[in-house]
Amino acid sequence: MASQGTKRSYEQMETDGERQNATEIRASVGKMIDGIGRFYIQMCTELKLSDYEGRLIQNSLTIERMVLSAFDERRNRYLEEHPSAGKDPKKTGGPIYKRVDGKWMRELVLYDKEEIRRIWRQANNGDDATAGLTHMMIWHSNLNDTTYQRTRALVRTGMDPRMCSLMQGSTLPRRSGAAGAAVKGIGTMVMELIRMIKRGINDRNFWRGENGRKTRSAYERMCNILKGKFQTAAQRAMMDQVRESRNPGNAEIEDLIFSARSALILRGSVAHKSCLPACVYGPAVASGYDFEKEGYSLVGIDPFKLLQNSQVYSLIRPNENPAHKSQLVWMACHSAAFEDLRLLSFIRGTKVSPRGKLSTRGVQIASNENMDTMESSTLELRSRYWAIRTRSGGNTNQQRASAGQISVQPTFSVQRNLPFDKSTIMAAFTGNTEGRTSDMRAEIIRMMEGAKPEEVSFRGRGVFELSDEKATNPIVPSFDMSNEGSYFFGDNAEEYDN
């Protein structure tokens, strides 16, 4: 049960497939991409968007959000039952940006959810195509991970803002299924569990009765998902303890926070997938490319090749730097918010800077922002090399890390040493080794103490030239170790607010 996530490949999770071979997986992922692309083309027609407007990432985000909201059954039911003033539960919409007389104008559109569902199903051969919806959720999640630092959320659950490298997927909706669970970081799972336990502490009936049984099985399922992400026996044993607790409370919260901290050095396996905005898939399908026939993978060269040949535009605020906006979106496209910046710079072929040094806010434009001063520019999403995405945490070693983020969660399977600030991390592990989990705690601390600075992760793995589609000649990068490795360094990234 523990390693339920590791039994099937990530593409199989992506497409709900039973064991398929590589060709079948590539075809079913391709089919999913085709569906998103066809839907996007149809929406651009409905909205009468020009080619340029259809390639605007802000329009893409609105269209993606509309279809996700149209299929959000729980929220739709909730809205039906709790009508709020000025909100039609049957409609969905958002800002669409058009170029009128040399200026960008914002237009608020509203559609029947039923109509959007019809267009989506039609684009997906009559299916609900849940995999495609999840794919868009993961793209939004990756964009949030790159744009915002979840300091407040971490502090609220009693964790430390420096643990932000564990927070991948923290904004994914609950309904994102197995593919969503695969990309969630250790910290995200721990945070969900802590929130659950806190509710149980405050609400006598949380674990009781018919609902309580459902709650309990959700709790155990989440514990198992988290257990499956850990790579050492002691960490997994600790998760068994948390899962089997009769009445989860503060002791379990302590254990969870302990295990999250330990994951800064004994990293868990977290999947990484390159999920691109719908406005990349649409034009590719429109140009006659058949993803299902050609096959597609989210963890290989395909997304890199697709981005090499795509034009995507973005609105730019008056004091934003288009190159910085490009970096933000590039990192989101490759699910690389918590990867080592030196490696990212090498793959991208241009310097990748920490979040706090970027002159750019998020990609979305708020409804109260002034459109008169809005410009648009091309996003540079191309890369110099490509590399295979990883779903392992790599093994560990140590290196000077920053005041903000004190560890990384690797995205690419490429040889390097993984930076983490051992003294800072170990300082958090003073004293408390009593209680039921004392032997596991002692064992985990011993392993962390033993993590060696000179150890190399992903030994022998390298990046590849874009012409090397079969990954035959790995190029092992060499790094300037004096450079800063963490993205959320000392940071002044905005907070993510729902």
Curated annotation (Swiss-Prot):
GO terms for biological process: symbiont entry into host cell; viral penetration into host nucleus. Signal peptide: none annotated. It comes from the Viruses. Residues 1-21 are annotated as: Disordered. It is found in: Virion; Host nucleus. Keywords: Capsid protein, Helical capsid protein, Host nucleus, Host-virus interaction, Ribonucleoprotein, RNA-binding, Viral nucleoprotein, Viral penetration into host nucleus, Virion, Virus entry into host cell. GO terms for molecular function: RNA binding; structural molecule activity. The keyword Acyltransferase does not apply. One of its GO terms (cellular component) is ribonucleoprotein complex. Residues 8-21 have a biased composition (Basic and acidic residues). InterPro entries: Flu_NP. A motif (Bipartite nuclear localization signal) lies at residues 198-216. Late in virus-infected cells, may be cleaved from a 56-kDa protein to a 53-kDa protein by a cellular caspase. This cleavage might be a marker for the onset of apoptosis in infected cells or have a specific function in virus host interaction. HAMAP family: INFV_NCAP (MF_04070). Encapsidates the negative strand viral RNA, protecting it from nucleases. The encapsidated genomic RNA is termed the ribonucleoprotein (RNP) and serves as template for transcription and replication. The RNP needs to be localized in the host nucleus to start an infectious cycle, but is too large to diffuse through the nuclear pore complex. NP comprises at least 2 nuclear localization signals that are responsible for the active RNP import into the nucleus through cellular importin alpha/beta pathway. Belongs to the influenza viruses nucleoprotein family. Homomultimerizes to form the nucleocapsid. May bind host exportin-1/XPO1. Binds to viral genomic RNA. Protein-RNA contacts are mediated by a combination of electrostatic interactions between positively charged residues and the phosphate backbone and planar interactions between aromatic side chains and bases. This is Nucleoprotein.
